[in-house]
């Protein structure tokens, strides 16, 4: 579908000259999955680790190229950039509510996908649950391939690996596979 819009081009004397432009509107090619992790610590201990800086403590192969933050850690309007295929991913924290154990981010890989990530922690005794939702929308041919490969099974495996890494850190204070690392 093509929608039309008018843009002001320039003002000449008392006349306004408009430029006609077109935009393409299409239905989204999107995949959304949610997974519930069971984490071996309460939300107050887990939530600070859901941060682009603190994640380097527990997640293998996680190292942002740049973090833009007034506090130096996760906060609303924090922006960070990570390596990604085929280039870089730009992340933006749009909601950061430590009092509710909730964080929401956007992740854009130009010409590939736009993603919304939501994480909600829920207390469960001395532990907590983390309900994690990724919603990927294609914004190009490479995104169509990615969305097709973002299956429930691939997401479950990704979430289980993340859960194992985070639980290992919560139990030992070290990254999985790095117990004896300096």
Question: Language-model segments: which ranges?
Answer:
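Hydrophobic ligand-binding cavity/cleft-lining segments
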Residues: 5-72
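Beta-strand/loop substructures that line and gate deep hydrophobic ligand-binding cavities in soluble
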Residues: 107-161, 177-179
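Amphipathic alpha-helical segments that line or abut small-molecule/effector binding pockets
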Residues: 44-47, 160, 164
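Glycine-rich portal/gate segments that line the openings of hydrophobic small-molecule binding cavities
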Residues: 54-55, 66-110, 161, 165-180
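A short, structured loop/turn motif at beta-sheet edges
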Residues: 40-44, 95-99, 120-129
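Short, surface-exposed coil-to-beta transition loops
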Residues: 32-34, 87-91, 112-118
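Short coil/turn motifs at beta-sheet boundaries
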Residues: 28-30, 84, 112, 125
